Amino acid sequence: MNIRATRVGEQMKKELSDIISRRLKDPRIGFVTVTDVRVTGDLQQAKVYISVLGDDKQRENTLKALEKAKGFIRSEIGQRIRLRKTPEIFFEIDETMEYGSRIEQLIRQISSDDHPAKEADGEPNNG
């Protein structure tokens, strides 16, 4: 990705966060965080990564609502960012947050499973 595409992506991320939180009134849209926007080098397409607070059903409903509002969102972006052509937007759920919390949970589980074994060996448990 070139420098211009990166800058446009960062600006779109800021504007999308504002549009989704303040301008969209669809009740299906839950608590959404725009985690990343990747714009192609020719500025024709933008992949928007979002994280949604809630279960799979909430994520699915939010994604459907965002897909339905895609035209409105794109026109808002076009008004806020001066580009010859506003990139086509594709929404995608960002799994990295969920993956990270799962890894953290597994580490905690392994750590708590380890502590009783150390105490049984006669070693003091310092932490």
Swiss-Prot record:
Q: Entry's SUPFAM superfamilies?
A: Ribosome-binding factor A, RbfA
Which of UniProt's keywords are assigned here? Cytoplasm, Ribosome biogenesis
Q: Which PROSITE patterns does the record cross-reference, listed alphabetically? A: RBFA
**Does this entry carry the keyword Cytoplasm?**
yes
Q: Which Gene Ontology cellular component terms are annotated? A: cytosol
According to its UniProt entry, the protein's GO biological process terms are: maturation of SSU-rRNA
Q: Which GO terms describe its molecular function?
A: ribosomal small subunit binding
Matches recorded under Pfam families: RBFA (PF02033)
**Where is it located?**
Cytoplasm
- Family to which the UniProt record says this protein belongs: Belongs to the RbfA family.
Q: Record's PANTHER family?
A: RIBOSOME-BINDING FACTOR A, CHLOROPLASTIC-RELATED
HAMAP family in the cross-refs: RbfA
Q: How does it assemble?
A: Monomer. Binds 30S ribosomal subunits, but not 50S ribosomal subunits or 70S ribosomes.
Function per UniProt: One of several proteins that assist in the late maturation steps of the functional core of the 30S ribosomal subunit. Associates with free 30S ribosomal subunits (but not with 30S subunits that are part of 70S ribosomes or polysomes). Required for efficient processing of 16S rRNA. May interact with the 5'-terminal helix region of 16S rRNA.
Q: What protein name does the entry list?
A: Ribosome-binding factor A
Gene encoding the protein: rbfA
